[in-house]
């Protein structure tokens, strides 16, 4: 809730907002889309993807002292993976018919991040 409150405050002031979060459920995406629609801003979803073994290897190298994430353990990753709901742009558009939406999928399997690339894009 605090994340959405802060985004609302920025948007209210005419600024842009990036909500950096693991939106694994469509209901969270709906909340963010509603904010963008309220302030007539384009809503961009940046979804990252890479092979499971790459993700788990990265998680294994993380430590609580050096990294802020909700996926600090293999189990946390697996839990998020199980709960993940496919991004449904049609649903977001039905709820916010005047909202411009872009969904980007970024392949993050390679290191360093400069080697990441957009592997998919859909606009509504």
Describe each model-derived feature in a short phrase.
Residues 1-44:
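Glycine-rich phosphate-binding loop used to anchor ATP phosphates in small-molecule kinases
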Residues 2, 31, 79, 83, ...:
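Alpha-helical elements of Rossmann-like donor-binding domains used by nucleotide-donor carbohydrate transfer enzymes
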Residues 7, 14, 66, 88-91:
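A general structural signal marking secondary-structure boundaries and capping sites
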Residues 19-20, 46-49, 104-107:
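Conserved beta-strand segments of the P-loop GTPase G domain that flank and frequently precede/overlap
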Residues 23-25, 49-55, 110-113:
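Conserved nucleotide-binding/hydrolysis micro-motifs of P-loop NTPases
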Residues 31-35, 59-62, 120:
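Short, glycine/charged-enriched secondary-structure capping and boundary segments
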Residues 38-87:
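A glycine- and Lys/Arg-enriched "phosphate-lid" helix/loop adjacent to the NTP-binding pocket
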Residues 57, 82-124:
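NTP-dependent small-molecule kinase module
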